[in-house]
Amino acid sequence: MFLLETERLTITEFTPDMAQAVHMNSLDEDTRRFVPDEVFETVEDAADTIDFLTSQYGGTEGPLVYPVLTKDGANVGYVQAVPLDEGQWEVGYHIGGAYTKRGYATEAVSAFLPVIMQKLGIDKISGICVSENLASRRVMEKCGFRLEYEGEGEYQGEKRNIARYVKE
């Protein structure tokens, strides 16, 4: 069982009873704008995704996605490691709109990175976002990533202006 605790947060594995919170956290405007493939229009869509994600926990093929909970049990978002090409990985994260601007993403990503990088046996991980997603960029910068590329690139199947960061 994956379990990681910080001062304010717990990062653990998904359970089926989290579907409602995952659904609700995915509906904010920033999710629709920046990560539209992570919007779950129904609780059933969220439950199906949780079912798939929990099937990935035994291995290292990914995606490896873990919910972020506050100490009082509120599901505020997730952190993830997603495989790219040729043994490379990308970190991802999302904090639901009702919980943003509290430093949860930075706290979760800072704690998650060393643990997941060790689990995967990697010494480098990327972070990619739409260039205009300033909040996501700030999280990566606070977590020690350096900007590697900014310009046109593919993002969620579309040509967009992206920022690609790397942490070694």
Give residue ranges: language-model regions.
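Acyl-donor (CoA/ACP) binding surface of acyl/acetyltransferases
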Residues: M1-R33, V65-E168
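Conserved GNAT-fold acetyl-CoA-binding loop/helix
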Residues: D30-F52
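Secondary-structure boundary/capping residues
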Residues: F40, G59-G62, I125
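Juxtamembrane helix-loop transition sites at the ends of transmembrane segments
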Residues: D45, D51-T54, K124, A163-Y165
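A short helix-loop-beta-strand connector motif used in the catalytic cores of GNAT acetyltransferases and
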Residues: F52-P67
